[in-house]
Amino acid sequence: MRPILLSGHERALTQIKYNRDGDLLFSVSKDQQICVWFAHNGERLGTYHGHQGAIWTIDVDPTSTILASGSADNTIRLWEIKTGRLLKTWDFPTAVKRVEFSEDGSKLLGVTEKRMGHLGTIVVLDIKLDVDAEQSDEKAMTIVCEDSKATVAGWSYLSKYIIAGHEDGSVSQFDGKNGDLLYNIPIHELNQPITDLQWSHDRTYFITASKDKTSKLITAKDLEVLKTYPADTPLNSATITRKKDFVILGGGQAAMDVTTTSARQGKFEARFYHKIFESEIGRVRGHFGPLNTVAADPTGKSYASGGEDGYVRIHHFDKGYFDFMYEVERERQNKLNQQQQQTISA
């Protein structure tokens, strides 16, 4: 599995994101650059200029028309993907750490930082998916996180809930329409921040990554923990693969703790776990520094990782990845194949 190395950033990556079709990959970093790449060959399509601070987060709407980014310059910006044109800027009192479009693209949530006397908030903006439409200045909803600030957040299926991960290791479920807090459950170790939250394809469950060295698979409906994936290093990111029942975790010793660590000791690897059986399957090495963000291609053919070293690596899975099965899975597949043949012959 030879990686394609994308060198378009001068500083650490903060987030990478595939569009819904899986043909474009967007990357943002602390160097104030947004890059977009063709996912199949790593060719750079272009960059989006305008932010005046480190860019923490990126998301793309379901139709691949509009791009949203959140930055340390205290703004959320909307861009036209095709031309790179800046469509709208919303200003906030503090940095924006996470943005995410709802399933239909009609709403955008933003997570703002707790700083300088301002409490952390989750804001919701109404979005028109027409590049020529006038976007509203008003926030449709603001949720104030009074206990522990939200570090990540996202929309569940049908925009029914807003799910947020917090600095104290808890996960909250808010009503997607009025912002009421429905649940707040301690999921990870106390005061070990949740660093990432990524959705399954149908948004009925999600995966978290945390500094407590674990990743958890959780239902959106009632925040029940389905699976736990233990690692031996603090985790920065986790994602769920399509086609195969795997999850990919990324992390490593924190950048500020790294002195003269070898890449092996620093544990700068992408880890593959079986989604159902919770056991580690393998690791992919390559980054020289912690993995800050991982993303799985929605078509299930590849995955990408972004590191503290400023590189994005796209890995296209080879045949062995798709053929790999546990014995129990293989037996089940053989049974299904036999049943199909019997029904055909009958």
UniProtKB/Swiss-Prot annotation:
GO biological process, one term: cytoplasmic translational initiation
Broad class of the protein's primary localization: cytoplasm
InterPro entries the UniProt entry points to: eIF3i, WD40/YVTN_repeat-like_dom_sf, WD40_repeat_CS, WD40_repeat_dom_sf, WD40_rpt
Pfam families on file: EIF3I
SMART domains for this protein: WD40
SUPFAM superfamilies given in the database record: WD40 repeat-like
Transmembrane intervals: none
Localization annotation: Cytoplasm
One Gene Ontology MF term: RNA binding
Protein family: Belongs to the eIF-3 subunit I family.
Listed name of the protein: Eukaryotic translation initiation factor 3 subunit I
